[in-house]
A protein has these predicted regions:
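Short, Lys/Arg-enriched, disordered terminal segments
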Residues: 1-4, 247-249
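ABC family nucleotide-binding domain
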Residues: 4-219
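Conserved beta-strand-loop-alpha-helix hinge in the C-terminal portion
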Residues: 223-249
């Protein structure tokens, strides 16, 4: 059975004017991402990965080339059209969680559904609860953001990304603010989502993350320099189990 293409970039270029100088941030990027893949996009500072993230997230459009998200051409869309598409098709997860402070987990997770007139308040609430249970926070439904650890807040952010049942989960340095143990706990969750058939793109500067994904794309100077399938995916659960437990009181 032919795999569904969720994301397709065709010779995408993005140029910016900085003063009198034109900067070529993306220089003809092309690739396809298929349903159910867990892809890391890596690159050092200045590689173009942040610009690419903005393209993938429909926050910006190419100077030339085509970006097709779940069958929808993005480049010629208006800003408002892209906002609607983004809310329906993409679940964002950020390094700094982007949660509303002093707001409960359920209320934070409900947010992406607030603008969907097809979803009733009761359904919105239930879907938020289901998403939080799916990330292991069934006992933290009504805790506020300022009452939770960094790992718990990132789980809320992941639940918020899942609640719309998006075509793709787009994570930007999603373990960047977490300690080693908590980072592995979040990677375990990403691997579980991948095993359940979710399409995940994880943008990072940390090459170790690539060990836990199914495919790795490397950027340098605005170009794809490698795009490889990972035939030896490491288990984040095993990595977590190998971390010594701190027994200090």
């Amino acid at each position: 059975m032919k795999k569904k293409v969720v994301i397709e970039l065709q010779n995408v270029r993005r140029n910016f004017m900085v003063g009198d100088e034109e900067v070529h941030a993306l220089r003809g990027v092309s690739f396809k991402i298929y349903e159910g893949e867990f892809v890391t996009i890596m690159g050092k500072s200045g590689s173009g990965k942040s610009t690419l993230l903005n393209q993938l997230g429909c926050l910006d459009t190419p100077s030339s080339g085509e970006y097709i998200l779940d069958g929808v051409p993005v480049r010629t869309m208006s800003k408002s059209q892209r906002a609607v598409l983004r809310n329906r098709k993409i679940g964002f997860i950020f390094q700094n969680y982007n949660l509303l402070s002093k707001t409960t987990s359920v209320e934070n997770v409900e947010l992406p559904l607030m603008y969907n007139s097809e979803v009733s308040a009761a359904e919105r609430h239930q879907r938020a609860i289901d998403a939080l249970k799916a990330v292991g926070l069934g006992d933290r439904l009504y805790h506020k953001s300022n009452q939770m650890s960094g790992g718990q807040m990132q789980r809320v952010a992941i639940a918020r990304a899942l609640v719309n049942n998006p075509a793709v989960i787009l994570a930007d340095e999603a373990t960047g603010n977490l300690d080693t143990r908590t980072s592995f706990e979040i990677l375990v969750l990403f691997q579980k989502l991948h095993a359940a058939g979710r399409t995940i793109i994880f943008v990072t500067h940390n090459p170790d993350i690539a060990n836990y994904s199914s495919r790795n794309i490397m950027l340098r100077d605005g170009k794809v320099i490698s795009d490889e399938i990972n035939n030896n995916i490491q288990s984040a659960a095993e990595g977590l189990a190998a971390i010594p437990v701190n027994t200090d009181e």
